Amino acid sequence: MSPTPRRSRPVAAATRPRPPRVSALEPRTAAPLATTRRTALARDGEPGAERLGVRKTYKLYIGGQFPRTESGRAYEVFDARGRLLANACRGTRKDIREAVRAARKAFPIWAARTGYNRSQVLYRIAELLEGRRDQFVSELMAAEGCGRRRAARLVDAAIDRWVWYAGWADKFSQVTGTVNPVNGPYFNFSIPEPTGVVGVIAPEESSLLGLVSRLAPVLVSGNAAVVIASESRPLPAVTLTEVLATSDVPGGVVNLVTGLRRELVGHLAGHMDVNALDAFGVDPAAATELEQLATENVKRVARPPAGGLGRYDWLAAAAQSPYLIGQFVETKTAWHPIGA
């Protein structure tokens, strides 16, 4: 009787690769994710290389620092086409208080600077903006839905506006200050001085040029500012604070809070340590309500045009004027006897 022949193992089965063993503690997506990263690293520098995008975190700007809101809340910011751009901090009443406290602390430092020095600092802001021009153009295109040419024009106008107001920093007192004629043996001098802490409600539609047009005249005379950014388009304003942080502006001179306006503007208008309020960025009806809140400590309030800002041209010559500086200065008059 012949022996039974042995069955040979199929060649395909012998050469078939075994699947890798995956530990029960290891996530199923770990291997593909690592592969993707290795591929991206291997192709670094080549066209079309895959990489993970770095999402920017937009924070508040208070006292020269970039803190998160004390509540930890955020809200979604969309571009002009309704696509999600980023999450911005949703500021609270406490954030307004902290911003006002920082502005009050920085005000005497900024007000004590000479007009010539403030002029240099404001010009430095324009220099830094010029270096980041392309970034601001891209942000305006996304935020306001305008074309590249229009966005570039708005950014250039914002840079030029800083330069224009920088030129007034050491001239405003010369133009508006005077020796008054009086009937008596006295000298009588009138000198403009900064008001103090000014609350600025940025225009909702013009996220960069509108903000610069209202903020720059506040800073020229030596005021400190607490700014509530545009609710729907806050990102260019936050990027502007990054420029301010790297410029020579002392920390606390400009403070920016983002969030829902209905939760912020009332607290800013009613704060007893705010000396003036720029309500140019709200509609006339809202400005009237803010004026009523501002009466508690007799704040000076700058109102918007009677018809609102619907068609306001921020590129027009009227959007920059030395008279805008005068909205937030106090005139001090001194008497001095004439010697023999």
Model segments located where?
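Short acidic active-site motifs
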Residues: 150, 186, 263-264, 286
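Short catalytic-loop micro-motif centered on adjacent basic/acidic residues
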Residues: 226-229, 252-256, 276-279
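Short loop/edge segments at beta-strand edges and connector loops
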Residues: 251, 258, 305
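Conserved small-residue-rich beta-alpha loop and adjacent elements
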Residues: 80, 167-250
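A charged, well-structured terminal subsegment
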Residues: 258-280
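C-terminal segments
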Residues: 3-10, 16-41, 49, 160-175, ...
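Hydrophobic/aromatic ligand-binding patch that stacks against planar heteroaromatic rings
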Residues: 216-219, 267, 293
